[in-house]
Amino acid sequence: GNTVNVLQDRWTYELVGLLSHGVRVGQYNRLIASLEGHIIGDPAFRFQPVEPNTLATDMTTRKGDAAYWRSLLASPWADVQSLALRMLTDAGAISAGELLEFMKQSPLATTRMECLKLIGRFGDEEIFAQAIIRGLKDRYELLRRNAATYAWQSSRLELLPALADTYVNDSESKRVAYIVMK
């Protein structure tokens, strides 16, 4: 009981747009397994794709094909770009620095959030700190909240000025301020 919406600041709809591209529900669940995520029914179920593609099979058959996933970085769809970034990261075919540059130039909020999350997997503290500082100023509130969480988890002193600035100057976002004060 009480397992729905108990966890706060979770990115519960990460990559959910892949379902509109014909990705099967079971494939999506493997990418985004969470305590609050439940599959009831057939995990092989899929929706009709918004445009013809082979994304559902490519996730398996082209898993290590870095050139293919790099080509999808130009997709107009945020979740397709995010999946491509995830596949490149999993294959070791993209660096934390490249992800930071992609985060800086992307107009898509969920893609920027995916970049921040993936940069955290590299262990490059300098680049991660740069991504956190950028994330604290992002217009997407979920990204700001996650950046604030990553900042206090990292305990890096150079993040203190950015956290203080966020607390003082981002008065519209009470949830970000709450995380900063942890």
Language-model segments: which ranges?
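Amphipathic alpha-helical scaffolding segments comprising HEAT/armadillo-like alpha-solenoid repeats
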Residues: 61-71, 92-104, 124-136, 156-168
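Structural detector for internal amphipathic alpha-helices that build alpha-solenoid repeat scaffolds
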Residues: 56-57, 79-91, 110-124, 144-156, ...
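Amphipathic alpha-helical repeat scaffolds
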Residues: 17, 70-74, 82-86, 100-104, ...
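Caspase-like cysteine protease fold
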Residues: 12-94, 112
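Short inter-helical turns and helix N-cap capping residues of alpha-solenoid HEAT/ARM repeat scaffolds
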Residues: 76-77, 107-108, 139-140, 170-173
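Conserved positions within tetratricopeptide repeat
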Residues: 29, 85, 97, 129, ...
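Short acidic/histidine-rich active-site segments
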Residues: 1-10
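Membrane-interacting alpha-helical segments
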Residues: 28, 173-174
